[in-house]
């Protein structure tokens, strides 16, 4: 049960770092593809 109790403390920073990184990467690729600045 200790692993299940530690999951939120692992997922919160992981999601908080990975999701914005993916969003920024997809946004930059979208801007480069459309040549809109």
Curated annotation (Swiss-Prot):
GO terms for cellular component: chloroplast thylakoid membrane; photosystem I. It is found in: Plastid, Chloroplast thylakoid membrane. The keyword Transmembrane applies. Signal peptide: none annotated. The keyword Plastid applies. The chain crosses the membrane at residues 7-27. GO terms for biological process: photosynthesis. It is a single-pass membrane protein. It comes from the Eukaryota. Keywords: Chloroplast, Membrane, Photosynthesis, Photosystem I, Plastid, Thylakoid, Transmembrane, Transmembrane helix. Pfam families: PSI_8. May help in the organization of the PsaL subunit. Belongs to the PsaI family. NCBIfam families: PS_I_psaI. This is Photosystem I reaction center subunit VIII. It comes from Populus alba (White poplar).
């Amino acid at each position: 049960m200790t692993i299940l109790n530690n999951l939120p403390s692992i997922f919160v920073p992981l999601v908080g770092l990975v999701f914005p990184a993916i969003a920024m990467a997809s946004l930059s690729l979208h801007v480069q593809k459309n040549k809109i600045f």
